[in-house]
């Protein structure tokens, strides 16, 4: 990504979550543990899905890709956030700031489309079970994943040029733990109304639209499973509950931040922490604790690993 901006500002100062060094030390310990667990948890899901023949299904293929996105989403800024907690002055370069913004919206866009793809997968599995393997074949699954990355790239690449070429000639303090469009663009020296419209139209409306589509899809699925057997209903509802929980946890903060991106919301930076640091660790917990197949496969994989170590 080429940065063409010739502003006087060469770096941004991040205020972080608190000015208390004691609290920052506690956050350093907490975020470090969360980050390590997030990476290991999502990595465990990926390894389990792609090394277990029983999980060679469209749903788990998409879940494995979602775990990769979550692991990457947790890594685009969190390591620097953790290191900054040990510093008095939290500084990020101009290029580094907009790289964070680009990656945030790229990965956020990919996750949105993946969640819609997972909803489509559940719709076909429950509403059209006889045609499931025909519709959700390997080519379709790969196409859904590739499409999610292309749309994520389009989503991020569309709005970045408008922001990166704004003139930043003075204020450079960002009231957050990392860079994001609403907080950075409001520091520009010119009227940013057009950029505000672009952000609301691109990030806000897309987030809200995807969320509504997902709610409608899962509502239709819940209506359909009423006609299933009690056993089928229980399994389907358990899976759907996990999916819906992830959708709400991810889209809730995004909609709040980007539908009203330039309001003075003191909670914005805490919401940013939630969907970039907390949500990626909740996804593997939600999907594994409510999924017997995943838990059984993880135990088998662990036993195989332990046995292989004992043999050597």
Curated annotation (Swiss-Prot):
Coiled coil: none annotated. GO terms for cellular component: plasma membrane. Glycans are attached at residues 5, 264. Disulfide bonds join 97-189. Keywords: Cell membrane, Disulfide bond, G-protein coupled receptor, Glycoprotein, Membrane, Olfaction, Receptor, Sensory transduction, Transducer, Transmembrane, Transmembrane helix. Pfam families: 7tm_4 (PF13853). It is a multi-pass membrane protein. SUPFAM superfamilies: Family A G protein-coupled receptor-like (SSF81321). This is Olfactory receptor 4K17. It comes from Homo sapiens (Human). The gene is OR4K17.
């Amino acid at each position: 990504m080429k940065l063409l901006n010739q502003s006087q500002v060469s770096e941004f100062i991040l205020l972080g979550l608190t000015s208390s060094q004691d609290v920052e030390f506690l956050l350093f310990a907490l975020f470090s543990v969360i980050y390590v667990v997030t990476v290991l948890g999502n990595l465990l899901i990926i390894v389990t899905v792609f090394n277990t023949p029983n999980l060679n299904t469209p749903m788990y293929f998409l879940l494995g890709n979602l775990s990769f996105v979550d692991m990457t989403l947790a890594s685009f800024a969190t390591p620097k956030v953790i290191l900054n907690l040990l510093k008095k002055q939290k500084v990020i370069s101009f290029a580094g700031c907009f790289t964070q913004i680009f990656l945030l919206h790229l990965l956020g866009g990919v996750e949105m489309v993946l969640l819609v793809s997972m909803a489509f997968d559940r719709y076909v599995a429950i509403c059209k079970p006889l045609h499931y393997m025909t519709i959700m074949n390997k080519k379709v699954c790969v196409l859904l994943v590739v499409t999610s990355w292309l749309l994520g790239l389009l989503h991020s690449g569309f709005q970045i040029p408008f922001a990166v070429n704004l003139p930043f000639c003075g204020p450079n303090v960002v009231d957050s733990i990392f860079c994001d469009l609403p907080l950075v663009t409001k520091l520009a020296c010119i009227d940013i109304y057009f950029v505000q419209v672009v952000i609301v139209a691109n990030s806000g409306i897309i987030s809200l639209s995807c969320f509504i589509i997902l709610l409608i899809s899962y509502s239709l699925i819940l209506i359909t499973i009423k006609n299933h057997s009690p056993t089928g209903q229980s399994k389907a509802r358990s899976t759907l509950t996990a999916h819906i929980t992830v959708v709400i946890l991810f889209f809730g903060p995004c909609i709040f931040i980007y539908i009203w991106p330039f309001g003075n919301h003191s909670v914005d930076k805490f919401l940013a922490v939630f969907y970039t640091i907390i949500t990626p660790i909740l996804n593997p917990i939600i999907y594994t604790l409510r999924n017997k197949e995943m838990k059984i496969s993880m135990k088998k994989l662990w036993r195989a690993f332990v046995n292989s170590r004992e043999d050597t």
